[in-house]
């Protein structure tokens, strides 16, 4: 069984080339199915997609042996290395095998690996290296890692995609799945996968006449409802063993789905109910990792290995660390059906924090591995007002359920900070949405389960800012965001310089007058320091809205804080207990069946 195949960069992937191959000297040429090395060339596959995570394969799976396979023709030297992170933080490596080859026709070389290393001491990753000397050339046509261990577990994987009016993205991903997996005889998922698309926008073909695809029109009750419907549809087939939740607007990699499937097939019994999580790589800087799992620390989300440049070998190794993760985001998250049956469905929170809450509820750390990922647009400059409402309301729900010792004081501090940051960003409507989120949280789970989520969302959208205006001057391009700032996290920080904080980020000082200054929506509050007029915009659409410094907003803030404090002090404990008591009902199959059915009925009555 091949557990990992050697991947070569395809056309249009120049920026990602070092995620596949590293050239230390000489030159090479890539073709569709082969790699040609010129003389005096040295290449390594110690990369994100081609290094073998041997330590994780041996930890989580039943494999008893491991072989490296390389198909080449020509002359050169083949080497297999084991590389790991030393206790001091450096990189150590050991040569496991070296083979000189000289062949006029393609020849497959297979090297046994585990007998060359102590299984108890296996660390890090394995990789292949090929070198040609003077007058030597070769062509690499195939490679990978195999095991003779036979899978004893039947895996039937269902991919559940939730979408809302993103036909282009969904169609593209479905085509990739069809061509690269379902119709590909060389894929382990050949005619052994099913895709369920929950269509919250009702814009896709209703009945897909395809054995591998089901499209389910669904009420737009948010991503949580879309994924709940996908889970429910998957569970109708008793043969389904795992549900892979996936966002509609990601760029998928077929080999990631194949690796997920192979991991599931070979997992040790003690890990059979573990979730497998995929990392998110940025779609603008495609070699930068945005997150590989996340931790939830006292109510604050911490992305693991964020801003990591995966072109660097040391970062590929660092990514092998099993740092504790509490959840994996649902842009790529594979959940065993047995876990869904035991732990239930998502909370009906529309969007945001549904994946965090589910990870905390299951209480199991997701398995993550290099190469299992998707590409997705980064979030720092997509800041719709409505997100403030969902972030605050849903964070209050999650913290009350899972953060020990969380009470009204902690909730009040979180709310005050959120409102203050919005004040510093001149987003006064968002301040009111934060307050609305607190009020709605205190209404309790009964209100949450009975409210019409689509109507609420529509109302919230009309309450917040809209990116509809065009700036008459020149605005910075999205690409002007410095890569160094992304790698260090400076581009997306709410931290404010202490000196600026003493003046409330310039609110206690005279504003600098002048023409409105364009500021990207996700920029840090310090970018607004002493600004009078600003134009806040989305760099993707180039649309935005005007705002300016209003002193009355500063003076009104203490009164709103006082109102919220009194309300939290009086009602928070009751609401918290109510959510704790209702969690089982809110995440049950019975609730979701009734909830979605009622939404369908209301929708039909309006027609």
Q: What spans do the regions from the language model cover?
A:
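Short beta-strand-to-loop acidic/aromatic patch adjacent to the donor-nucleotide binding site
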Residues: 238-251
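Donor nucleotide-sugar recognition loop
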Residues: 330-332, 341-360, 365-374, 386-387
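A recurrent flexible, glycine/aromatic-enriched loop bordering the glycosyltransferase active site
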Residues: 306-333, 382
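Terminal low-complexity segments of carbohydrate-biosynthetic enzymes
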Residues: 1-125, 130-131, 393-394, 400-607
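Conserved donor nucleotide-binding strand/loop of the catalytic core
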Residues: 208-225, 233
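Active-site donor/metal-binding and catalytic loop motifs
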Residues: 141-149, 369-385
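Short, well-formed alpha-helical segments that are part of the catalytic scaffolds
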Residues: 166-185
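Conserved donor NDP-sugar-binding/catalytic core segment of glycosyltransferases
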Residues: 255-303
């Amino acid at each position: 069984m091949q557990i990992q195949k050697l991947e070569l960069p395809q056309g249009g992937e120049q920026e990602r080339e070092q995620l596949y191959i590293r050239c230390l000297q000489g030159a090479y040429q890539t073709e569709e199915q082969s790699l040609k090395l010129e003389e005096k060339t040295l290449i390594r596959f110690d990369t994100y997609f081609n290094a073998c995570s041997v330590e994780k394969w041996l930890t989580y799976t039943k494999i008893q042996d491991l072989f490296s396979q390389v198909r080449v023709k020509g002359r050169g030297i083949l080497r297999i290395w084991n590389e790991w992170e030393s206790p001091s933080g450096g990189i150590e490596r050991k040569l496991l095998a070296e083979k000189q080859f000289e062949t006029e026709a393609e020849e497959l070389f297979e090297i046994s690996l585990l007998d060359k290393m102590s299984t108890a001491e296996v660390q890090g990753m394995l990789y292949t290296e090929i070198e040609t000397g003077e007058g030597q050339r070769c062509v690499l046509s195939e490679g990978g890692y195999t095991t003779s261990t036979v899978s004893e577990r039947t895996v039937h994987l269902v991919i559940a995609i939730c979408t809302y009016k993103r036909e282009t993205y969904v169609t593209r991903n479905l085509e990739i799945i069809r061509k690269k997996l379902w119709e590909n005889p060389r894929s382990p998922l050949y005619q052994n996968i099913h895709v369920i698309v929950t269509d919250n926008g009702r814009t896709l073909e209703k009945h897909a006449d395809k054995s591998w695809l089901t499209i389910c029109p669904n009420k737009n009750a948010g991503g949580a409802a879309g994924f709940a419907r996908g889970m429910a549809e998957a569970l109708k087939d008793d043969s389904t063993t795992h549900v892979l939740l996936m966002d509609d607007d990601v760029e998928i990699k077929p080999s990631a789905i194949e690796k997920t499937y192979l991991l599931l097939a070979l997992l040790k019994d003690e890990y059979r109910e573990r979730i497998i999580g995929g990392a998110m790589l940025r779609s603008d800087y495609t070699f930068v990792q945005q997150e590989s799992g996340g931790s939830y620390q006292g109510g604050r989300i911490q992305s693991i290995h964020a801003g990591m440049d995966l072109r660097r070998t040391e970062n590929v190794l660092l990514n092998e660390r099993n740092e504790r993760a509490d959840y994996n985001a649902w842009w790529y998250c594979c959940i065993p059906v047995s876990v869904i049956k035991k732990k239930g469905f998502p909370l009906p929170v529309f969007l945001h924090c549904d994946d965090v809450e589910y990870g905390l509820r299951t209480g199991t750390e997701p398995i993550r591995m290099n190469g299992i990922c998707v590409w997705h647009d980064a979030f720092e400059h997509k800041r719709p007002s409505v997100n403030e409402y969902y972030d605050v309301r849903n964070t209050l729900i999650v913290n009350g359920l899972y953060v020990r010792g969380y009470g009204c004081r902690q909730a009040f501090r979180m709310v005050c900070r959120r409102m203050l940051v919005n004040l510093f960003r001149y987003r006064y409507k968002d301040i009111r949405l934060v307050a609305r989120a607190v009020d709605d949280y205190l209404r309790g789970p009964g209100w949450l389960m009975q409210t019409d989520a689509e109507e609420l969302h529509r109302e919230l959208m009309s309450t917040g800012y809209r990116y509809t205006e065009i700036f008459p001057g020149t605005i910075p391009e999205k690409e002007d965001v410095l890569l160094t700032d992304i790698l260090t996290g400076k581009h997306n920080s709410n931290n404010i310089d202490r000196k600026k904080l003493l003046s409330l980020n310039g609110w206690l000082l005279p504003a600098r007058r002048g023409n409105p200054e364009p500021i990207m929506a996700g920029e840090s509050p310090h970018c607004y320091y002493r600004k009078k007029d600003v134009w806040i915009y989305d760099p993707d659409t180039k649309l935005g809205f005007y705002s300016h410094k209003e002193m009355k907003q500063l003076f009104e803030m203490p009164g709103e804080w006082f109102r919220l404090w009194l309300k939290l002090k009086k009602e928070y404990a009751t609401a918290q207990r109510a959510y704790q008591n209702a969690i089982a009902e809110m995440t049950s199959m019975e609730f979701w069946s009734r909830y979605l059915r009622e939404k369908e009925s209301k929708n039909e009555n309006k027609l």
